[in-house]
């Protein structure tokens, strides 16, 4: 009998041990955006310009605050206008990572670490991401020297470009990290989708290029989203009939603006519950709705008007237009 009990006890212990080994630690996920803008006025035959540079970072962070995965991308969007106040039509906006070898950094970049190789932008971003893995946010901040380039570790990894915006975006991403169902086995991806609306200046009204840039970070497993974060940046370049223009240097996303965005005061109660949530609250509702879906499922969250969400999304409290968020979320989930 004792032998039987001993065997049974060992079996139970083995089952418990294997059950414990089967548990996978869930991680926090965060997304951060660092963006700045600059502008030059038009002068004679030289067009004025407006430029938005927005870097997005996504991180998976463990219980010790160490980065398990990191993803980066940058949108460098430029627009022009003439000295007569005419908005020049913008072309397609493609991120630096998505440009791949077409960014052509290898042909014109500098060999700052002396190894005889200049990597493309996306390769250098990959190198910086790899250096971040296993580090805390303070250790990532310590990678930056002279306010612009990376230290010897970053350089040796093959990332010789300026990394100040990378560091700032990663710092924000870690600060924004929240508990999720994502694990180290998941795929992490970021996405940026940009659009611009333009109008010419008149004698009585300013012209403008108005950007809307949507960001998404998705952790996926088997094609299904385990964690999602979304955000949007609005940036406007106004110019007069002579092409004079100014722009704010540093920009805040709508999530960062929080209650200062003031959607609750002026938004519409489209679902009839008597409540209008702030933009960041509605974006959180949208992001939550994406969890468990694949890219096609996220696309299906958009109603037939191609602007608002479906009824279930509106009932949950996301009554604003979500087409740009959905485009970014779909791209991140693919």
Regions found by a protein language model. Give the residues of each.
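Active-site- and interface-proximal helix/loop "cap" or "latch" segments in soluble metabolic
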Residues: 25-334
């Amino acid at each position: 009998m004792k032998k039987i009990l001993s065997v049974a006890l060992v079996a139970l212990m083995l089952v418990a041990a294997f059950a414990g080994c089967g548990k996978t630690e869930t991680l926090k996920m965060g997304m951060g955006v660092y963006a700045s803008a600059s502008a030059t006025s038009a002068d004679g035959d030289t067009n004025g310009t407006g430029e938005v540079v927005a870097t997005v970072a996504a991180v998976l962070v463990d219980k010790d605050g160490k980065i398990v995965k990191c993803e980066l991308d940058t949108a460098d969007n430029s627009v022009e206008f003439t000295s007569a106040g005419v908005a020049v039509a913008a072309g397609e906006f493609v991120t630096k990572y998505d440009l791949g070898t077409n960014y052509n950094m290898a042909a014109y970049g500098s060999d700052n670490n002396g190894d005889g190789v200049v990597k493309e932008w996306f390769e250098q971003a990959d190198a910086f991401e790899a250096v971040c893995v296993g580090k805390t946010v303070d250790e990532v901040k310590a990678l930056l020297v002279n306010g612009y380039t990376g230290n010897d570790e970053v350089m040796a990894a093959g990332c010789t470009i300026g990394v100040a915006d990378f560091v700032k975006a990663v710092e924000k991403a870690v600060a924004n990290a929240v508990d999720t169902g994502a694990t180290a086995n998941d795929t992490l991806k970021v996405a940026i989708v940009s659009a611009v609306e333009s109008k010419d200046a008149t004698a009585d009204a300013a012209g403008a290029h108005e950007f809307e840039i949507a960001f998404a970070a998705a952790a996926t497993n088997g094609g299904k989203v385990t964690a999602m974060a979304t955000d949007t940046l609005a940036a406007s370049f106004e110019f007069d009939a002579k092409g004079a223009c100014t722009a704010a240097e540093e920009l805040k996303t709508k999530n960062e603006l929080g209650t200062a965005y003031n959607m609750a005061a002026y938004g519409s109660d489209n679902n009839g519950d008597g409540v209008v949530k702030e933009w960041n609250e509605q974006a959180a509702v949208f992001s939550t709705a994406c969890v468990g879906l694949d890219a096609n499922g996220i696309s299906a969250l958009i109603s037939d008007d191609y602007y608002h969400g479906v009824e279930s999304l509106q009932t949950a409290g996301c009554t604003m237009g979500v087409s740009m968020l959905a485009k970014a979320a779909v791209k991140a989930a693919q």
